Every structure is written in C-alpha cells, then in structure tokens.
A protein has these predicted regions:
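Hydrophobic alpha-helical core bundles mediating ligand binding, dimerization, or RNAP-core interactions
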Residues: 27, 31, 38, 101, ...
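Helix-adjacent hinge/juxtasegments
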Residues: 77, 81-115
Length: 185
C-alpha cells in the first residue's frame, strides 16, 4: 500500500510523507482557492451582500473577516497551531485580506507539514463540546472554508464578474485556466 501511495503522489506531482499528508495537501490547495476567489473581488465589492435588506447573508467583507477569524480560532484552540499574528489585517481592503490570510495560512501549512506523526493527527482534542481527532477537525475546517468560498463565487456572479477557474475548469471559463491572484488591481 505504501508503494502504491508513493506512486500515486508522485504521479500527481506532490509527495506525501505521512498517512495524513492528503489533508495537508487539501488544505494547501484550499487556501490557494480562497486567495484566488478573494483576488477576483474589487474593494468596492466588499459591502455587497446577497440581498441588500437581508443581513443574514454576510457581505463580502464579513465573509473575509469570518474566514480569517474562524480559521485562526480553529487552528489555535483545536489544533494547537498559533501563527502569532492577529487574524485580521490592519488595512481591511481586498489586498489587505489577501496578504494577511496568505501569510497566516502559509504559516499554518508549514506547521501542518511538520506533523508527520500519525499519533498527532489521531489524538482526540476538544471540538467545541465534543472530542474529535485532529484529522477530523481539519476535514471540518476545509469543508467550512469550501462552503464560504462557494458563497463568495455566487456573489461574484451576482456582481456580473468573471469567475476564473481556481482549480481546474469552470462553466465560466470553458477551459483550464490557473488563476493567479493579482494584488495590483
């Protein structure tokens, strides 16, 4: 099985030196997807919400704040990974959020890459009021992030923006385009 896993990971272009490496790789790609989607917004889009009179639907700015704060809380409280930085940027612009989240999530990724002992991933720790393994918690974190990223992509469409492919083709592009966040726009 180890040989097969090694061959598969080599074929895909990345190496997973541990049983839970697939979770590290998934977090790595998810953070890039978030950064790609955020970079497609404009600063004037930040107050936009799905329906102007319904405050239950978070604005783009509130979504960015939530992502930064909730991911920081998950990693600090549940996974024991603190990057030693405030979760929100001083400059709450699109660029500020992309830079802050990009920096902090890369630090988290580096720590996750260092967790090569299966026991760390399998240890049960507090997930709110229940005990769960760290692997389970990271899966929940990734799913939560993906859910909000989908909402943000829907808001880009409501704003009549082009939605570039952040990981493979989408209906908007019709072909494979890897979108690189443009911080200078």
């Amino acid at each position: 099985m180890q040989i097969l896993l090694h061959l598969i990971t080599r074929k895909l272009g990345y190496c997973i030196p541990m049983r839970y490496g697939f979770l590290v790789h998934t977090y790595e790609t998810e953070r890039l997807k978030v950064l790609g989607v955020w970079s497609m917004f404009r600063d004037e889009d930040l107050p936009f919400r799905p329906h102007p009179s319904d405050t239950r639907g978070l604005s783009v700015l509130e979504q960015m704040r939530h992502q930064c704060q909730s991911e920081n809380a998950f990693f600090c409280r549940m996974l024991g990974i603190d990057v030693g930085a405030p979760p929100l940027p001083l400059d709450e612009t699109r660029r500020g959020f992309v830079l802050q989240y990009g920096t902090d999530s890369l630090k988290r990724l580096d720590v996750l890459r260092s967790k090569t002992d299966d026991a760390w991933w399998e240890e049960e720790v507090a997930f709110f009021d229940v005990m769960r393994s760290r692997a389970w918690i990271l899966v929940r974190r990734i799913a939560h992030t993906s859910h909000h990223r989908g909402q943000q992509m829907a808001m880009l469409r409501m704003l009549n923006r082009e939605v570039f492919s952040v990981y493979g083709p989408t209906a908007d592009t019709g072909k494979q385009i890897v979108y690189t966040p443009a911080l200078s726009e």
